């Protein structure tokens, strides 16, 4: 799968990139904020976006809306440490492909990726 990473934390970005590559996926772009995410999506046309929920400037929810304005079928995995039922309901209502909770294990990540195929 071709993946765009949208995450402001360099260590988390590095970790997700390494796990994706270990599982045979291609990271086609990285972004740290909303404008870079939308630009990266438009330029790279990824199969899926890993999107942090809390980013500088715009929230992940706002960026999700921006991505869907570019491509209503955009597949997005939200990455977050926030555990709230209301957030989960909102994300599910917005049609995210999955929610990846931080911290996560390799097995958690592998299972998530297997379910996305």
Describe the predicted segments one by one.
Residues 7:
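Conserved acidic carboxylate
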Residues 10-29, 94:
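Two-component/phosphorelay signaling modules centered on CheY-like receiver
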């Amino acid at each position: 799968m071709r993946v765009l990473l949208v995450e402001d934390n360099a260590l988390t970005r590095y970790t997700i990139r390494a796990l994706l590559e270990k599982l045979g996926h291609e990271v086609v772009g990285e972004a740290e904020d909303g404008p870079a995410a939308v630009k990266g999506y438009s330029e790279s046309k990824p199969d899926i976006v890993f999107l942090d929920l809390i980013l500088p400037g715009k929230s992940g929810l706002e960026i999700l809306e921006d991505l869907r304005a570019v491509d209503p079928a955009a597949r997005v995995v939200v990455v977050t440490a926030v555990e709230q039922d209301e957030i989960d309901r909102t994300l599910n209502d917005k049609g995210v492909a999955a929610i990846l909770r931080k911290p996560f294990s390799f097995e958690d990540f592998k299972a998530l990726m297997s379910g996305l195929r």
